[in-house]
Amino acid sequence: MYKVYLKSGKEESLKRFHPWVFSGAIAHFDGEPEEGEVVDIYTSKKEFIAKGHFQIGSIAVRILSFRQDEAIDADFWRRKLRIAYDMRRSIGIAENPTNNTYRLVHGEGDNLPGLVIDIYARTAVMQAHSAGMHLDRMAIAEALAEVMGDKIDNIYYKSETTLPFKADLYPENGFLKGGSADNIALEYGLKFHIDWLKGQKTGFFVDQRENRSLLERYAKGRSVLNMFCYTGGFSVYAMRGDAKLVHSVDSSAKAIDLTNQNVELNLPGDVRHAAYAEDAFKYLDRMGDQYDLIVLDPPAFAKHRDALRNALQGYRKLNVKAFEKIKPGGILFTFSCSQAVSKENFRTAVFTAAAMSGRSVRILHQLTQPADHPVSIYHPEGEYLKGLVLYVE
């Protein structure tokens, strides 16, 4: 196994169990590891400190273990996946009769940086965000099949768009096990078509489950606007919550089709719903003041720190329009899923938008990702989803 030696003092973050080694912290290599290989990491005093997947880039090593005697083998993957599953079962997410849609592995939050696994009924969708996880995909899939047993029939690998383009990895999406065409999953008693073949992320935004459920509590009798609706999750929950009407908007015609399918799947023939394929900002410009519950759940405006300024301007602009148009006594659910945007950045952008609109605004809830998207206490960067529920006078 190749060795990586750190510069003096650069081991401090690893002593605090942070799961990344940045390229600037490395003094030299003992040999020339290939991307995705497991390497041992040593301090400048030649003391072992951790091991992980090597990759060319800013994050040079993603830590898999802080134990020198722990091999990264089949037993390792089985053990880690079992721990992840047992945690979700113990908190009532896995093996829940009303919900078979959840995240089984959430990267650093489950001490498996670079790996995401979502469960949709009897299909697991696996996604690699690092070269190492891609190269280990078959071993991971075998361990996953053992741990889940008869709870899943299919494992679909979806990493064509998540791996670094400079790495010669040639990932191909496809089934590693099974191949079922059944793509309907259950979330708190509601059914959803999951497009893991061509949809965004793994096919569904699992991280908004609890926030969708919260919105259902506020929907009764309200006119609801769901912006950036994608699969229509918030729309379906609002309708079950007895909303007066629900309008879904997305720039993608395919997303609108999927939203309409999901509404029809749960509430066939319900005339309270209408969907529009239109740019969000244009729709907000032309709409009247008929809505008293608005959801703003845009795609990530900033995927990197260098895009932060423009992202914050985008959040301000979007929220100003919502504040200006929402009815008095209305409720605004507003989100950011950009990891580069901190909780403080996002709140400041929304507060600025409120002030610019001249409306009186109160915070009802401060939202984040659900328990199946855990954040390692040693990796605060993992808290990426920010949300506010606001009462607008």
Regions found by a protein language model. Give the residues of each.
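Conserved class I S-adenosyl-L-methionine
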Residues: 221-230
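Non-catalytic accessory regions of SAM-dependent methyltransferases
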Residues: 1-115, 119
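Mobile active-site "lid"/loop adjacent to the S-adenosyl-L-methionine
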Residues: 291-321
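C-terminal catalytic and target-recognition region of SAM-dependent MTase-like enzymes
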Residues: 331-393
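S-adenosyl-L-methionine
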Residues: 254-295
